[in-house]
């Protein structure tokens, strides 16, 4: 199927949401940089690639930042994922209130590198904006750690993808450039054992998390996909864990046969919080096949993220 020979140089859409969140984040950080907090290190998770508090690949029921009951909090993050054929950079902002409400904004910049060149689109970047919201519904992972009731939260992620010269191909495949994910998460902290477990159910139409649009011809309904995380708190500043995220396979088969087959994601990570306001995460990630019609190898690689929270 011929691809439109367009260049990925269209003007970026105005980042109104990011500007508002950045202004609010700066004000909150200045106001609360020296405020005391009772929140235990790392129990608020880190920031996922979609912007929500949790692990690197999946949201948890925890609320991000250092805010506790009655407090406002803010967190900013920058991440990079590098695999055999692709590189993705992520930046995000998170606002929280009362350890119950969370609003996030993330931007993903996915460099297609050799795959873009093979498709006749050299220099192609897939850019996605993600506006998210989460609310804690019941439980408290820390204060009620002696109870069997987990902390439970529900969230939404509104995603818009700027596919540049790939947009005509996505349209031919029946994929949309706008989508909404809905999820519910349950997080249980076994404080005495230093063990945290999380389960998430996500309703989604996303192809490769939305980077290849949403849905496809004959596959335009929501799928319910499970996600799991486990983390061991080795001490108050260091955690090790793993995540698994099942994903739909809407573009397999397609006009390209199995050339857009999609696999599940997983990672093995280590998170370190040298101070109350800073955390660093590194991980080995396995993202499976991404456009195997061109990039035939599975996309394994590294993930690194830095988060600043107040």
Descriptions of predicted regions:
Residues 1-46:
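Cleavable N-terminal export/targeting peptides
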Residues 10-12, 27, 133, 185, ...:
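Short alpha-helical segments used as structural interaction elements across diverse proteins
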Residues 168-177, 201-203, 212-221:
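Short, surface-exposed, charged loop/turn segments at secondary-structure junctions
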Residues 35-174, 178-182, 187-195, 235-238, ...:
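Transmembrane beta-barrel domains of Gram-negative outer membranes and organellar outer membranes
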Residues 212-220, 224-310:
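Outer membrane beta-barrel transmembrane domains
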Residues 191-205:
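A structural motif
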Residues 113, 208-210, 214:
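Surface-exposed beta-strand-turn/loop segments characteristic
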């Amino acid at each position: 199927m011929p691809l439109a020979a367009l260049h990925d140089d269209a003007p970026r859409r105005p980042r109104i949401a990011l500007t508002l969140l950045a202004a609010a984040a700066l004000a909150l950080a200045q106001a609360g940089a020296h405020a005391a907090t009772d929140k235990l290190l790392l129990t608020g998770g880190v920031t996922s690639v979609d912007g929500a508090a949790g692990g690197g690949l999946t949201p948890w029921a925890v609320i991000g930042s250092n805010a506790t009951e009655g407090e406002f909090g803010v967190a900013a993050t920058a991440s990079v994922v590098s695999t055999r054929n692709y590189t993705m950079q992520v930046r995000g902002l998170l606002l929280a209130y009362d350890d119950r409400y969370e609003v996030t904004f993330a931007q993903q910049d996915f460099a297609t590198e050799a795959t873009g060149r093979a498709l006749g689109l050299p220099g192609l970047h897939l850019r996605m904006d993600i506006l998210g919201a989460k609310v804690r519904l019941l439980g408290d992972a820390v204060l009620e750690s002696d109870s069997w009731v987990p902390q439970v939260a529900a969230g939404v992620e509104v995603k818009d993808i700027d596919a540049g010269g790939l947009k005509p191909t996505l349209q031919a495949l029946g994929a949309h450039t706008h989508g909404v994910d809905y999820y519910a998460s349950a997080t249980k902290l076994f404080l005495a054992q230093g063990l945290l477990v999380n389960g998430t159910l996500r309703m989604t139409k996303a192809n490769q998390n939305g980077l290849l649009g949403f849905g496809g011809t004959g596959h335009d309904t929501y799928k319910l996909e499970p996600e799991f995380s486990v983390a061991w708190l080795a001490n108050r500043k260091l955690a090790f864990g793993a995540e698994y995220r099942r994903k739909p396979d809407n573009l397999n088969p397609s006009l390209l046969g199995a050339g857009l087959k999609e696999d599940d994601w997983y990672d093995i990570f280590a998170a370190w919080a040298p101070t109350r306001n800073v955390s660093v995460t590194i991980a080995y990630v396995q993202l499976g096949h991404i456009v195997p019609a061109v990039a035939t190898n599975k996309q394994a690689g590294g993930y690194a993220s830095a988060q600043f929270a107040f």
